[in-house]
Amino acid sequence: MTRLHLAFECQGKRCGATLDNAPGTTGLLLISGGNEIRAGAFNGQARLGAEIAGAGFPVFRFDRRGIGDSEGENRGFRKSRKDIAAALLAFRAIAPQVERVVGFGNCDASSALMLASGAGCDALVLSNPWTIEDDEDDAPPPSAIRSRYAEKLKNPRELMRLVSGKVDLKKLARGLLRAGRTHSASSSLAEGMRAGLAEFAGDAIILLAEGDRTAQVFVERWDADDARIMRCPGADHAYSSEEARAWLRQQILKLLRAQRVK
């Protein structure tokens, strides 16, 4: 594997990028979530890129406009379609052996791919998609709150805290009110993601870290019977544990290998 730092242009603005090159004809385009730089939190995306490239698949990471090494205004994930499309063109130009590209994003990066109907990618790995509107809080969905309270009721220490007055009753009342709802309210963001993904003709998988609030809210707002959903038990949002990281890497490699034989 060789690592190359480079730049490409998106609507007249210079954007920073990194290629972990490999001989494979299927590549991974890694889109950053939130306002993270392309290396990711604690260098996690750089590490993932090196691991995937080590398995024979080139990986292209980039900073969208206004983030990290890139010029311009940060317009957020909802308006990042052109950034993704420009990165895809740059990837194909710098690694001409690449015939098919799998797009991967976590959190709102996966939402961006869904809203953009893949933005030109041939297949998608969509991890913990963000469906929370700007004016909403990111509290757990009703089902997760009910599960948490059920566990507390089994714990004698928690019951003692309740009867001894050590529990904030106002906070408890708010939690019970949330828990009593049948499901989280839908969002226009989730509907837009659903419509965008429906227009995507390639393979797509949806990966959910079961310990992640973002994933829990997504489940409440998505079709529970969607066969594309795969779950990683106990994993957090960033797949921090070695077991979760191995699971994530395995799912990505599986889809990359499936594209290679098409």
Annotate each language-model stretch with its function:
Residues M1-T26, S241-E242:
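N-terminal cap/lid segment of alpha/beta-hydrolase-fold proteins
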